[in-house]
Amino acid sequence: MPIEFVCKIKFAEGEEAKGASTEGGGTGMLDEGLRRQKEGMADLASFASSSSLHGLARALGTSERLGFRQTLWGLALLVSLGLFLYQATWSAATYLERPHLAALREETRRELTFPAITLCNVNRFRFSALTDADIYHLANLTGLPPKSRKGHRPSELQYPPPNMLDIFQRTGHQLEDMLKSCNFSGQNCSSEDFSVVYTRYGKCYTFNGNKTSPKRVRQGGTGNGLEMMLDIQQDEYLPIWRETNETTLEAGIRVQIHSQNEPPYIHQLGFGVSPGFQTFVSCQEQRLTYLPQPWGNCRASSEPVIPGYDTYSVSACRLHCESTQVQRECNCRMVHMPGDADICAPSKIKCVDKALASLQKSTGDSCPCETPCNLTRYGKELSMVKIPSRGSARYLSRKYQKSEEYIRDNFLILDIFFEALNYETIEQKKAYDIAGLLGDIGGQMGLFIGASILTILEILDYIYEVAKNKIKQLLKPKKSQKQTNQRNLIQEQIQRTKNLREQNLKAQLTAGAIATVRFEEVKVKAANDVAQPHSAHPTSVLPNHHNAQQAVQQDFAC
């Protein structure tokens, strides 16, 4: 007859809780959103701990809850980042303002190219050279009343159509008559060394205007440049009958010093020289270099030149604008203006004056003349002495067969020379270029956050990986609704079974459990214990009704 033992068994409360937890973990599923959030925090912590950005590892190097030290490090990192962004923004704004500065230096040469000298008599027409037809046609220009034969009105007189170019050539002051003496660097010169050029003053003359082989000087000071004695011929000046836009009240010559690549714009850029004086003009060459856009507004030499000129200059641009405006409103051009249009007749002088006045009143948008990026100009200093002296007046009177009064009223001496064989260079330079910007930002980045370009690449690489994973999750194909329903049903069944087991286990833990052990099973257990003396935990003969999947240590008493 089998012998039965009645034992009261009570499970360890901690171990049972552990077993219940293990069972629940094996069958339950974590919330997907929570899992992804934890994974993201872990990835961020891993990136922060390996990043070369100073302070990031101390602030975000762990996925645990932020502590006091981590909070302080995070605040320090944010403040440093804010200061860096402020300084970097200020540096970028300064760069976008395109600041520049001017660098001035002086250089010396063994020889310098002498500038071109253009001179004009302020009187356009010689009175003695005007014919009746000239006076008739030039009435609107000169203000002189036309001559009329006895018994005929001026409107009845028949004259050939005027040719303004021919009129300027015939009636302008001739240089061979005005030039009394000429000397350049100790060598005599004559009217043949001058070329004819037409300006608003009519027929003018340019010395050293050859672009290919300009004259050069090897010494500075008086006597080492151009020295001329001129007779302005005041007795040939037109009498003033009435004032017009072309009427002049002064006597003398107009002079402009310019480079060979620049046409004369003498009515605005020239200076006057009076008779009865010797005028000394000390020059200094200035070479200017401007910055192109966006740092400046100069015109680069690579841009197309203005039609009619070999090189671009402000004077050429203004003359081109004037010619275009006059051709647009009057269908002609003045003698000194470039172009292929017909030369305006004297009857269109009022139209020309109106067109030029409208151009002058414009704001410059209709004719923007930019400064060339490379420009040569000449600074001037003028001084004068009176001529002739009492001792030389009689000598000059005998030499030129003129009265002393005529010499005082008409003669002048012009002396143009270099002060020294040096020139000034005025160059615009970038005050803050891209190299300075990158240097400032790099220094600020290292000072405030201890980062570099490679650190930025690390952050971009991390952002790329995170974005790639997010996109993969969004593009991952979803399961069918049927599979989803089946999965939900299985999860509900598992949860129901889990709850039922937890209730039974809780009841057994509270009231204790009764187990029946047969005597034969005890003997089998003893035999097993003898066969396995080294077992750390002897095998229990009690049936395990509490956890069918894993063994549980049990304490019992019979």
UniProtKB/Swiss-Prot annotation:
Motif GAS motif per UniProt: ranges: 450-452
Residue positions with a glycan: N140, N183, N188, N210, N245, N374
Highest taxon of source: Eukaryota
PROSITE patterns: ASC
Molecular function GO terms recorded: ligand-gated sodium channel activity; monoatomic cation channel activity
Pfam families, alphabetized: ASC
Family, per entry: Belongs to the amiloride-sensitive sodium channel (TC 1.A.6) family. ASIC4 subfamily.
Described purpose of this protein according to its UniProt entry: Does not exhibit measurable stand-alone pH-gated sodium channel activity but may form pH-gated heterotrimeric sodium channels.
Assembly and oligomerization: Homotrimer. Heterotrimer; with other ASIC proteins producing functional channels.
Name of protein: Acid-sensing ion channel 4-B
